[in-house]
UniProtKB/Swiss-Prot annotation:
One of its GO terms (cellular component) is cytoplasm. Coiled coil: none annotated. This is Peptide chain release factor 1. Keywords: Cytoplasm, Methylation, Protein biosynthesis.
Length: 370
């Protein structure tokens, strides 16, 4: 590798890791649980990079030793063959380790560790689009469960023929945003709808938005910009349903965003949930503007998360899911059951390749050490 800037960065990461390890051993930190958790999390985030760097250093030393044996083998053909084979194998290992280190050193998305609000809206296609939105709610719920994440439906607008006009899922767990951020965009389905008597294939769409959860400090909302009304809810609440107005209809005047929350048991809880969703929506709008600005400089094949970008087609007749960003096909049946990990990892890998290519073309990567 070893580009000079990468080696300097690795040494810096190693030094930070050692300092965090030293701090964890300090008895004083045990009296501050929040600080202990923060330091432990920071150290854990560097551990794979440091371990890989140590393996890379060890492999470099082994290559030097194997080359020395090859040099000293002289006329011993068997020894020369063994040493040459070892050098070849070690050089392959070294290349793999270098590629892994470059990926590990890519700048992390500050939102990657966050929980998300996943919004699904029925698009073109009438009743069938709403049914399709319901299928996507099920797909993402199944996938989240396979990742041991916690899923909760926090807002819904039911459609007459089944499914949803709109639904919002709250998904909590380990690195949720890092995996689901590439799911944002238009999901198109081609199939014979249950409402179609003639057996003709229809095309419908649903739009997915991925919104990192944010707190009040990250997104501040002026109370004067909010209009709130209440209504009787048909959600949880038993005999209170027809007596108490627990549902909350929140309207944000500057953006025109409207949120209707009925899933919680009290009006206060529904109001808090509506505000939480609004903060996530406003943050996602700001995030999209930033990503589109970056995208104008670097056209990402994986996509910017634009709501209007058609990212995937689900074809029932051919049992095929086509991801248009990857140019690859996957099994439809598996995907609809939530088995989309291979698609997600392919998107992550493509994004990493693009960012590595961009890094390689950057002027600051020019100096090289041997």
């Amino acid at each position: 590798m070893a580009e000079a800037y990468l080696l300097e960065k690795l040494k810096s990461v190693e030094q930070t890791y050692k300092e965090l390890t030293r701090r964890l051993a300090d008895p004083d930190i045990a009296t501050n649980p929040d600080e202990l958790q923060r330091v432990a999390k920071a150290r854990s985030s560097l551990e794979e990079t440091v371990n890989t760097y140590e393996t890379w250093q060890k492999t470099k030393e082994e290559i030097t030793g194997a080359r020395q044996i090859l040099k000293e083998a002289g006329g011993d053909s068997e020894m020369r063959e063994m040493a040459a084979l070892e050098v070849e194998e070690l050089e392959e290992q070294l290349e793999q380790l270098e590629n892994k280190l470059k990926v590990l050193l890519l700048p992390r998305d500050p939102n990657d560790d966050k929980n998300i609000m996943l919004e699904i809206r029925a698009g073109t296609g009438g009743d069938e689009a709403s049914i399709w939105a319901g299928d996507l709610v099920r797909m993402y719920s199944r996938y989240a469960e396979s990742q041991n994440w916690v899923v909760k439906l926090v807002s819904e607008s039911l459609a007459d023929m089944g499914g949803f006009k709109e639904a919002i899922l709250e998904i909590k767990g380990d690195q949720v945003y890092s995996k689901l951020k590439f799911e944002a965009g238009v999901h198109r389905v081609q199939r014979v709808p249950v409402t179609e008597a003639g057996g003709r294939v229809h095309t419908s769409t649903a739009t997915v938005a991925i919104m990192p959860e944010v707190d009040e400090v990250e997104v501040q909302i002026d109370p004067k910009d909010i209009e709130v009304s209440t209504a009787r809810s048909g959600g949880a609440g038993g005999q209170n349903v027809n007596k108490v107005e627990t549902a909350v209809d929140l309207f944000h005047k500057p953006t025109g965003i409207r949120i209707f929350c009925t899933e919680e048991r009290s009006q206060l809880q529904n109001r808090e949930r509506a505000m939480q969703i609004l903060r996530a929506k406003l943050y996602e709008m700001k995030l999209r503007e930033q990503q589109e600005a970056v995208s104008s400089m670097r056209r990402s094949q994986v996509g910017t998360g634009s709501r209007s970008e058609k990212i995937r087609t689900y074809n029932y007749k051919d049992n095929r899911v086509t991801d248009h960003r990857l140019g690859q096909n996957f099994s439809l049946v598996g995907a609809l059951e939530g088995d989309i990990e291979v698609i997600i990892q392919s998107c992550i890998g493509k994004d990493q390749q693009e960012r590595l290519a961009e890094l390689a073309n950057s002027p600051e990567t020019a100096p090289v050490l041997n």
